[in-house]
Amino acid sequence: MKKITFALAALLALGVAGCATSQEPANTEGANQPAAEQAATAGAEDAVAFTDDLGNEVTVANPQRVVACMGSFANAWELAGGTLVGVSDDALTAEGFAIESPDVATVGDFTNVNLESIIALEPDFVIMTSGTGGRGGDSSQVDLREALVSSGIPVAYFEVTTFDDYLRLMRTFADITGDEAAYEQNAASVQQAIEGIKSQVPADEAPTALVMTTYSGGTRVQSSGTMTGAMLADLGVRNLADENRSLLKDFSLESVIELDPDFIFVIPMGNDAEAATAALNEATAANPAWNSLSAVQNGHYVTLDPKLFLSKPNANWDESYQVLYDTLYGQN
């Protein structure tokens, strides 16, 4: 009797085991997938595709090793919630940019960034400017695109002149970082403040103005196609350089005196702002007719802070608008 009982028990045990092994296997796809493939799969899910300002299609996936080759772009990337491993020199030396990423390396001056330094940082995303070097140079970061792409490094080119350009840049950056709160704080709220300032512009006033950047070697006049010129246009100002295009190439005090604008805005440029301002003051002092200008007599000859009107003000763009509005209309 005991033998029969033991036999039945053994058969039952085998039956249970058979049922267990006949069940569908657990989903072990993720566990058996190599780590590199898992990372690639996760990256594909986080990938963001966009068109840069040169018309290039760019795709990046949650980049963690980002190099920004212009100070304002480095600042904007951090404002959008990103971190950096490399920046151009001006990101660390120019006033107004407080780079917070730890142990960030430099890749050279933005007018002539070093390709080898960039690649050595093993970036997974490089942010570059589509403009030329400036400062009288003709270098271009666009020339480095082929080398970066052939090295498997995603690179995007941007050009920011107006606030709308900055807003578009921040939208792209925030889409990549996924930090919508950062976009709201450092872009959308700034836009709201600017719209509030613009809504206060008197409809029946259109003051005339000239904007000049001065450096130790001379002076240049800005049109409405520049950063400060665009802000003035938004605030109802008539830029006389738009109507007298020769001023953009050949600046002369005599032309300014003849036009007699209501406002003259001066932006010191270069490493030595004091020397730049002194050069212009010396030139104006030598011309007795300068003091007869309406802008000079009415206290409307204004030197603007380069942090707000030469470098891109980014999250402080509304402050730039406010300074101009107060100068134009706040003292009336």
Model-predicted segments: where are they?
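Acidic/His-rich segments in extracytoplasmic proteins that coordinate ligands and/or metal ions
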Residues: 89-176, 255-258, 262-264, 271-282
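Structured C-terminal subdomain patch of bacterial secreted/periplasmic proteins
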Residues: 165-169, 175, 263-332
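Extracytoplasmic strand-loop-helix segments at the start of, or within, the mature domains
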Residues: 62-91
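Bacterial Sec-exported substrate-binding components of ABC uptake systems
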Residues: 2-8, 18-73, 180-211, 326-332
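Short helix-initiation/N-cap motifs at beta->coil->alpha
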Residues: 52-54, 106-114, 244-252
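Bacterial Sec-type N-terminal signal peptides, specifically the leucine/valine-rich hydrophobic h-region
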Residues: 13-16
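A local structural motif
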Residues: 45, 57-62, 97-106, 235-245
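Alpha-helical, coiled-coil/dimerization segments enriched in small aliphatic residues
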Residues: 91-93, 220-249
